Design a protein with these regions (language model features):
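N-terminal amphipathic alpha-helix/helix-capping segment at the start of soluble metabolic enzymes
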Residues: 2-30, 142-155, 206, 212-213
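Hydrophobic faces of well-ordered beta-strands that scaffold small-molecule active sites
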Residues: 28-33, 52-54, 80-84, 103-105, ...
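Catalytic cores of alpha/beta
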Residues: 42, 46, 87-101, 105, ...
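Alpha-helix-loop-beta-strand connector modules within alpha/beta enzyme cores
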Residues: 63-97, 119-127, 151-154, 196-220
Length: 262
């Protein structure tokens, strides 16, 4: 019986494409997905967002929800990263096996956190991730172990570290192995004691300069594309704009305002 060819996930192609854009200094714009509805992923892509970040930190999404969103994004060719609140190797492995292009880690403070993130997302000898071919990214076994390991070595997951506190350790050590140093301005402001706009801007600039010196892309979150420069994100190559919840809530409020809803 002739076997029907199975088109495996093209997640490695999407990783290469995103990394190429970041390396070339071209801006990528995405949004957070906090609702367990696959239509959100499609709407984001149709609106022109270049990637989505499925949010397992500030949302009610379960792991099952996140896996469903990642698989839907993968099947539709939409690059999907997943934001996680901590390095959880088994969870990270399942997310990557189902088509996540990368992992975005909240509250990155230390070089040890960065090392554990690298270990959880890379196979030996550069990491400690457990290997399985029984998943969509490996074609459920249609890809050989040797070929799969080569694909992963050539196009590893994108790694984004969120800088949301003061950093006491040397920046190069904390940012080692990352693709993006992502400044979380809200948590950074709170952790710095709600500083003045000037003081916060200086803190954001320190992250940008550290990213530049370490050879990684600079990124951050903004409520809108137009608001990014005022937050010190004019040069952000990896920009996450709003979220599905934020955009929906703003639209609902606008629909009830005398000037909105047209």
């Amino acid at each position: 019986v002739a076997r029907r060819r199975f088109d495996v996930s093209s997640v490695h192609e999407r990783r290469r494409a995103l990394r190429s854009e970041l390396t070339a200094g071209r801006r990528l714009v995405g949004t957070f997905v906090k609702l367990a509805n696959a239509d959100i992923v499609e709407m984001a892509a149709a609106a022109g967002f270049q990637f989505v970040v499925v949010d397992l930190e500030h949302s009610t999404l379960t792991e099952v929800d996140a896996l469903g969103l990642v698989r839907h994004a993968d099947a539709g060719g939409v690059p999907a990263l997943v934001r996680v609140p901590a390095v959880d190797p088994p969870l990270i492995a399942r997310l990557l096996e189902n088509g996540a292009v990368g992992i975005q880690l909240s509250m990155l403070r230390t070089a040890e956190q960065a090392r554990r993130l690298m270990a959880a997302t890379h196979f030996a000898p550069s990491g400690e991730r457990s290997v399985s071919l029984a998943n969509r990214v490996a074609g459920f076994g249609a890809t050989s172990l040797r070929d799969f390991l080569q694909l992963e070595a050539e196009a590893p997951p994108l790694l984004v570290g969120q800088i949301e506190t003061g950093i006491a350790e040397p920046w190069p050590d904390v940012l080692h192995g990352l693709d993006v140093a992502f400044v979380g301005t809200t948590d950074l402001s709170v952790n710095l004691g709600l500083p003045s706009i000037g003081e916060l801007s200086a803190a954001v600039e320190r992250v940008r300069l550290a990213a530049e010196a370490a050879g990684v892309a600079f990124g951050g979150w903004s409520a809108s594309l137009s608001a990014a420069p005022a937050q010190g994100l004019a040069e952000a190559g990896y920009l996450v704009v709003g979220s599905d919840l934020q955009i929906l809530a703003a639209g609902l409020r606008a629909a009830l305002s005398p000037e909105g809803g047209n």
